[in-house]
A protein has these predicted regions:
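Substrate-binding pocket helix/loop in short-chain dehydrogenase/reductase
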Residues: 144-145, 152-154
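Residue(s) in the substrate-gating loop at a strand-loop-helix junction
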Residues: 186
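C-terminal helical subdomain
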Residues: 219, 226-227, 242-281
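Active-site helix of classical SDR
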Residues: 168, 202
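Conserved glycine-rich cofactor-binding loop
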Residues: 68-69
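Conserved NAD(P)H cofactor-binding loop of Rossmann-fold oxidoreductase domains
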Residues: 136-141
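Active-site loop immediately N-terminal to the catalytic Tyr-X3-Lys motif
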Residues: 146, 193-197
Length: 281
């Protein structure tokens, strides 16, 4: 077990702040500390718009996690422009307000809390079955394996692996046949690099999870789409939780990356590797 400053609780304890002893095999109880979230008490129930290979985003009920980030905010913008009904989840109150969504469509929540993914899904599913879930959460770290701390490793896997798994687990019962769940593992999941080994391992773990989960979810006719765009100019590299980014070549335009991913969603794609973004470098 390792020491962590994150918030967790077992099935018999309240959420607590500050250093706690944590093990990855903690029981996730799925409950919510009501003081930590602000969800609209009522929401109009909408008719499900089934996803097909010719699915239109207009009218879709969509949950975007990590909505205040470089990619997440652009997902929200493009989805709203396409006529989707978006519930945006993020940790930054100010950036959520800047998305300029109607009341009840934003939720300030830290999805690293084991019960938070349930709250996020419940908020969006209150309007009807989910057509699309986009997970744009993620953190990055740089440094050799010898230098990366245990706390950094824990944060990488908590945010980049545990959150997508918990969000997928929470969302699946609320998704009707034909819907889709999108995660972003990135090109690093295809080939790891020195100085990014632990970060790359977390993203490879996410990709591996999706390979298995996709086969389970398709029994319910829910599509799981792994996307692996190359380096994109979102500013994430400058906000590393440890280390300093190397001198990357100019990355992809984030609006273009989001557009390609959403096109893949509407086209019924089941995988979106780095090669799909190559022409947009």
């Amino acid at each position: 077990m390792v020491r962590s400053s994150h918030r967790f609780r077992s099935s018999s304890k309240e959420v607590i702040a500050g250093p706690v002893t944590w093990t990855p095999f903690l029981v996730w109880d799925g409950r919510v500390n009501e003081s930590s979230v602000d969800i609209a008490a009522t929401a109009p129930v909408r008719k499900h718009v089934p996803m097909t290979s010719s699915f239109a985003l207009a009218g879709a009920n969509v949950l975007v996690a990590g909505a205040t980030g470089g990619l997440g905010s652009r997902f929200v913008g493009q989805l709203v422009a396409a006529g989707a009904h978006v519930t945006a989840v993020g940790r930054d109150h100010g950036r959520l307000e800047a998305l300029d969504l109607p009341a009840g469509q934003t939720l300030a929540l830290d999805l690293r809390l084991p019960n938070a993914c349930v709250a996020a899904v419940d908020a969006a599913a209150g309007r009807g079955p989910l057509d699309l879930v986009v997970n744009a959460t993620g953190v990055v770290a740089f440094g050799t394996v010898a230098d990366v701390t245990i706390d950094t490793m824990e944060e990488l896997f908590l945010t980049n692996v545990f959150v997508p798994i918990m969000l997928s687990q929470s969302a699946l019962p609320h998704m009707a046949p034909g819907s889709a769940i999108v995660n972003i593992s990135g090109v690093i999941a295809e080939q790891n690099l020195p100085g990014m080994a632990t970060y790359g391992a977390s993203k490879a773990a996410l990709r591996s999870f999706q390979e298995g989960f996709a086969r389970e979810a398709r029994r319910q006719k829910v599509r799981v789409l792994d996307t692996r765009p190359p380096h994109t100019e979102t500013g994430l590299a400058s906000r590393a939780i440890q280390g300093t980014a190397p001198n990357f070549a100019q990355g992809l335009d984030p609006d273009t990356v989001v557009s390609i991913i959403l096109q893949a969603v509407t086209d019924g794609a089941k995988d979106l590797g780095s090669a799909a973004f190559a022409s947009d470098r």
